[in-house]
Amino acid sequence: MDSEKVIKRDNEYVLHTYNRNPVVLEKGHGLYAEGPEGQKYLDFTSGIGVNSLGYCDLAWAEAVSDQAHKLQHTSNLYYTAPCGKLAKKLCKRTGQSRVFFGNSGAEANEGAIKAARKYSVDHYGKDRTTVITLVNSFHGRTIATLTATGQEVFHNYFGPFNEGFLYAPAGDIEALQELVDRNTCAVMLELIQGEGGVMALDPDYVQAVRKLCDEKDLVLIVDEVQTGVGRTGTFLSCEHYNLKPDIVTLAKGLGGGLPIGAVLLNEKVAGGMGPGTHGSTFGGNPVVCAGANVVVDRMDTSFLANVNDRAVQLRAGIAKLPHVKSISGIGLMVGIEFYDVAAADVLAACREKGLLVLTAKTRLRLLPPLTLTAHDVDMALEVLAEVLGAMEPTAPKEQA
């Protein structure tokens, strides 16, 4: 079916909740995707950070296919080997004690909020349930995680929203301290605010948050849905901050292309989550976990060294481009701020030349597969240089 027919059918029957690019992708390999008419794209979005090993990695595809031919689903009434195998790897890799599996980042963050409140209510009583998040954060689109998201643009509809969430400006420890009271149970943050503009938190601020949580016995939740599993050049972005959270959430790149969410809890918080406190019919699905095991196994020292090398190469090349004001993020989570052109216009022009990129507010956002080569980086920089070199100054446009 050609692209026009695919788009027409989608627009007729699929709920219009997405502002899609006018692109149909039919197949892919590595960093490259192809449309029905043979259009080829160099993908620096990786499905918003999901395809960590690129399209159709051979070992990943074989593991998923093999498991699908053995046993595709059981629910959590029974044990399956891929689930426990993945949980052990994640605990050993991160130092956490237990894992709960769901199907998305929003589900993982819901689970983290529930676990934090359960710990606090068990130890301090039923009123200690407030979670403080940061302004410009993004934690999901369920009612609870939408409420946790510190951006008013997401709070215009769907009310009434859940009670029990407050927002502190990122980087201001005094403002956070002022919000903490007897009803506070947790602080939840992204170390790099992805949807909020690819902005990394200051290390001193992060350590001050950890100290405050220790002093008040607040549960510290770090949302690594977008930053985790090698994206920043370490398995967790927490490693850049020498930070040990009470709860870490993962999703996106963990599954390598299949839906997964994970809540990693330390022993203190995990102890309160017994049978019946939480659940998921599809969580820990053996097919998904088979793929995730391949992803985690791939994240060895040499793999992460290449992530860091390519990040240095990419950032150095971007710094030489016209119109570039600043570069944000860590590793291969890259935000580009422009002086005088709109990120949305850059995105559209790149797409026309076969390079797929993202935006985050007024910034261009790059989330390439972690398997990229030096040649892939050179090709992307070549397109960006051509696009930006041809652009006239305009007023930047913010993207919701």
Give, region by region, the residue ranges found by the protein language model.
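Conserved N-terminal phosphate-binding loop of PLP-dependent enzymes in the Aspartate aminotransferase
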Residues: M1-A400
